[in-house]
Amino acid sequence: MAMDAQKQKALDMAIKQIDKTFGKGTLMRLGDKEFEPIAAISTGSLGLDMALGIGGIPQGRIVEVYGPESSGKTTLALQTIASAQKEGMVCAFIDAEHALDVVYAKNLGVDTDNLLVSQPDFGEQALDVLETLTRSGAVDLIIVDSVAALTPKSEIEGDMGDTHVGLQARLMSQALRKLTAILHKTNTTVIFINQIRMKIGTMGYGSPETTTGGNALKFYCSVRIDVRRIATLKQGESQIGNRVKAKVVKNKVAPPFRQAEFDIMFGEGISYIGELIDYGIKMDIVDKSGAWFSYGAEKLGQGKENAKLTLKENPKLREEIEMQVKEALGFGEALGMDQEEISSADQ
């Protein structure tokens, strides 16, 4: 709809005044600038990348990964770091829990020699480090593990039994207000790992679970991922890993509420090859007859673990199956598919 000359002149003058006061580009028409699709960092899980809708964690955004203990939250964060480092990105890990396992991180493919690590003494220090790294514009991905461990200084220095109502929530709210404006300019991605707590007095109405750190993080996040362990993987009598379900409960960059299931193997992390087999079966690329897995005329092995071992030892065959699976899913077309239909395969 055309604007009359007088209004147009007034608008142009207003834009010039705003640009002069706050800098060029402060106010613009969307049609004057070409916007590129949101770039993403792979999570290391094919299914979760699909569920997120853009092929991974969105760059330049705040993301929350939460769930019960030992559900795979830190593993997911470390796998994302490994993926980012392979793309030449600079990554940092703010270890507020002081529990980072360097050997495990190496096993997941993290370049620990070039990973920036901070183990802060209290919450304010952790968030100051986070803000400084973000403002520098030199760090692409920062993990904060975890929100629950961001204890305010006054609580640490106080006596046992002292009450500190809402201190951590106020701290998080202030930090997130400052961070949001910076992230857009520096394109830094921040992933907060969070724990869940039980609400008191829900009386059966609504979910009894909530996350720590107040409500601010829920609002400022572009993506929230709920990670749950749903089964234990066994080989004979030995436990070798967990089957995990990740549900995207909030997504500002794609449709939400999609979910994915994948295996996390003890000491190895997310089983990408296991996902290839699962998706291969769903897409009729890999055949499963009884306990036997095969690809065309090639026998992959009896049992999923043997099939995974065959593909691990034969990179050429693995790449061939991977190419066909990705082509069958096709990250443009498949991002709109129902994740519940393709997220889990026959065991």
UniProtKB/Swiss-Prot annotation:
In terms of superkingdom, the source organism counts as Bacteria
A biological-process GO annotation? DNA repair
Q: Name one GO cellular component term.
A: cytosol
Amino-acid positions noted as binding ATP in the UniProt annotation, renumbered to this chain: 67-74
Pfam short name (any one) = RecA
Transmembrane segments annotated in the record for this chain: none
Which GO molecular function terms does the record list? ATP binding; ATP hydrolysis activity; ATP-dependent DNA damage sensor activity; damaged DNA binding; single-stranded DNA binding
Location relative to the cell? Cytoplasm
The UniProt keyword set, sorted, is: ATP-binding, Cytoplasm, DNA damage, DNA recombination, DNA repair, DNA-binding, Nucleotide-binding, SOS response
Q: Which InterPro entries match?
A: AAA+_ATPase, DNA_recomb/repair_RecA, P-loop_NTPase, RecA-like_C, RecA-like_N, RecA_ATP-bd, RecA_C_sf, RecA_monomer-monomer_interface
Q: Which family is annotated? A: Belongs to the RecA family.
Q: Give the matching HAMAP family.
A: RecA
Q: What does this protein do?
A: Can catalyze the hydrolysis of ATP in the presence of single-stranded DNA, the ATP-dependent uptake of single-stranded DNA by duplex DNA, and the ATP-dependent hybridization of homologous single-stranded DNAs. It interacts with LexA causing its activation and leading to its autocatalytic cleavage.
- What this protein is called in its record is Protein RecA
Query: Could you tell me which species this protein originates from?
Result: Sulfurovum sp. (strain NBC37-1)
